[in-house]
Amino acid sequence: KEKGPSHQINMEDIPGPNECVSELEIKKKMIDKVPAKYRDFFLREKPIEMRHLPGESMFDEPKNKLPYKHVWMKAVGKLPDDALQHQAILAYASDMGLLSTSMNPHKLSFAKGNVMSASLDHAMWFHRPFRADEWMLYSTDSPSASNARGFNRGSVYTEKGVLVASA
């Protein structure tokens, strides 16, 4: 740590995690669209709980034509007090759902089956201490898509609005 000036871009005023729908609930509502042999895999519990704003899940038909998304996320269960472990978990979690942000303006969706995607690279900057087992807001945007590539970036905030990481 070094002393010096400090600032951050403020977190948007959006509904909190208790006002959002869990990814598991979204999946349960669409389970009839999933072939029977894949249903257990589709509904399996993940190590990261995610809660999406209405219409912003990667499984939803994009209603928002702007290249922005927001998701609340946290690790399932209590984690040890090891900052590196929390950073590793956030780095893992921050790659989930990031790609779908650049699809919004084009009405593309994983649910439609008309998308093939992969992360070409992924970088993280950790600004302030945080706990990955507490709710964090992941606000993503996509300033550009061209040549079959979508550029996405994100900001991670604590529930109190402290910017803790950027991707």
Task: Indicate residue ranges for each PLM-predicted region.
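Terminal targeting signals and extreme-terminal segments of soluble enzymes
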Residues: K1-A167
